């Protein structure tokens, strides 16, 4: 079972549908209706932390999930989930130079992990006004994808390789290979 932490975002069920279409059972829980103890009892194969409004400090259980479970359970943070990974690892979250709500960008990547067998670059849809600050990027994270103006679009923890984040929305119809990216995550160790 794949657990999706819902940060009160309208895209959460699009993510759940994509995961279901890839053949996985999905459980969606709101970020204030579950805790780490309950998650451990559920024993999910993987966790996805959804997009949502606000800042990482307003993402309910998301920060606790990352800090408590990243060593044991593969976690993918999407948008706010990605920012939460940056924040909990010591990064600064800042306003993006140009707000990107429903805009597409070319995404360049390292061709590894989530990005295996994806075109480089590919088009992805962005819905955000905050980003992880490259100037204060955590040393225990690696940048794995970026835009042509060097905005961080994905990261991976250097020690807990199962902890990854993506700023863009793989569930959007305008993200060219979002389903394959999710499949790469779901098929990974």
UniProtKB/Swiss-Prot annotation:
Q: Is Oxidoreductase among the key words of this record? A: no
Q: How does it assemble?
A: Tetramer of two components I and two components II.
Enzyme class, broadest EC rank: lyase
**Encoded by which gene?**
trpG
Q: Where is the Glutamine amidotransferase type-1 domain?
A: 1-189
Q: What is the recorded name of this protein?
A: Anthranilate synthase component 2
InterPro entries per UniProt: Anth_synth/Amidotransfase (IPR050472), Class_I_gatase-like (IPR029062), GATASE (IPR017926), TrpG/PapA_dom (IPR006221)
Q: What catalytic reaction does the record list?
A: chorismate + L-glutamine = anthranilate + pyruvate + L-glutamate + H(+)
This protein's UniProt keywords: Amino-acid biosynthesis, Aromatic amino acid biosynthesis, Chloroplast, Glutamine amidotransferase, Lyase, Plastid, Tryptophan biosynthesis
Gene3D superfamilies per record: 3.40.50.880
- Other facts: Component I catalyzes the formation of anthranilate using ammonia rather than glutamine, whereas component II provides glutamine amidotransferase activity.
UniProt keyword Lyase present: yes
The annotated active site, in chain numbering, is: 79 (nucleophile), 169, 171
For this UniProt entry, the molecular function terms from Gene Ontology, in alphabetical order, are: anthranilate synthase activity
CDD domains noted in UniProt:
GATase1_Anthranilate_Synthase
Q: Superkingdom, according to UniProt? A: Eukaryota
Give the record's GO CC terms.
chloroplast; cytosol
Extract one GO BP annotation from the record: L-tryptophan biosynthetic process
* Involved pathway(s): Amino-acid biosynthesis; L-tryptophan biosynthesis; L-tryptophan from chorismate: step 1/5
The species this protein was found in: Porphyra purpurea (Red seaweed)
**Compartment(s) where it occurs, according to its Swiss-Prot or TrEMBL record:** Plastid, Chloroplast
User: Which regions span the lipid bilayer?
Assistant: none
């Amino acid at each position: 079972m794949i657990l999706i932490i819902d940060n009160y975002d309208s895209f959460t069920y699009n993510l759940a549908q994509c995961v279901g279409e890839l053949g996985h059972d999905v459980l969606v829980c709101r970020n204030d209706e579950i805790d780490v103890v309950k998650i451990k009892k559920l024993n999910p194969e993987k966790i996805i932390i959804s997009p949502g409004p606000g800042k990482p400090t307003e993402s309910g259980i998301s920060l606790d999930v990352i800090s408590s479970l990243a060593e044991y359970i593969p976690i993918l943070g999407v948008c706010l989930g990605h920012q939460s990974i940056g924040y909990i690892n010591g990064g600064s979250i800042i306003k993006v130079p140009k707000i990107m709500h429903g805009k597409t960008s070319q995404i360049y990547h390292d061709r590894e992990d989530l990005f295996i067998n994806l075109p480089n670059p590919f088009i992805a849809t962005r819905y955000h006004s905050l980003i992880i600050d490259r100037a204060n990027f955590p040393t225990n994270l690696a940048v794995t994808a970026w835009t042509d103006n060097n905005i961080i679009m994905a990261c991976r923890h250097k020690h807990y390789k199962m902890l990854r984040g993506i700023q863009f929305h793989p569930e959007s119809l305008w993200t060219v290979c979002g389903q394959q990216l999710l499949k790469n995550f779901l098929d990974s160790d």
